[in-house]
């Protein structure tokens, strides 16, 4: 089983027991986090796409670590002006281990079966 979730303006393809690094999330080590913005859910040859999200689906994870990314240097120089500026930035990151994927009541097979439209009946006179 896999799911595509959206968090921090990015999309992540996850499955159970995956470890992902996302933008900083509130919480301490060991806290549970839930991602409700599931874009796609699937597995075993079947998948469900959201429009834009799948209703009731969620992915649950556990915070492994709060850390900071590598230092990125921003250097600007104006030639012949004896002017320069050097700044550094480190992004706050959260390491999350995915513990479970929930389809939200409907499995991909059930969702595909329910999306089929019944044949139109003859109008009554």
Swiss-Prot record:
Residues 75-89 have a biased composition (Basic residues). GO terms for biological process: translation. SUPFAM superfamilies: L21p-like. Residues 106-125 have a biased composition (Low complexity). It comes from the Bacteria. Pfam families: Ribosomal_L21p (PF00829). The keyword Acetylation does not apply. InterPro entries: bL21-like, bL21-like_sf, Ribosomal_bL21. The keyword Metal-binding does not apply. Keywords: Ribonucleoprotein, Ribosomal protein, RNA-binding, rRNA-binding. GO terms for molecular function: rRNA binding; structural constituent of ribosome. One of its GO terms (cellular component) is ribosome. Residues 75-94, 103-125 are annotated as: Disordered. Belongs to the bacterial ribosomal protein bL21 family. Part of the 50S ribosomal subunit. Contacts protein L20. This protein binds to 23S rRNA in the presence of protein L20. PANTHER family: 50S RIBOSOMAL PROTEIN L21 (PTHR21349), LARGE RIBOSOMAL SUBUNIT PROTEIN BL21M (PTHR21349:SF0). This is Large ribosomal subunit protein bL21.
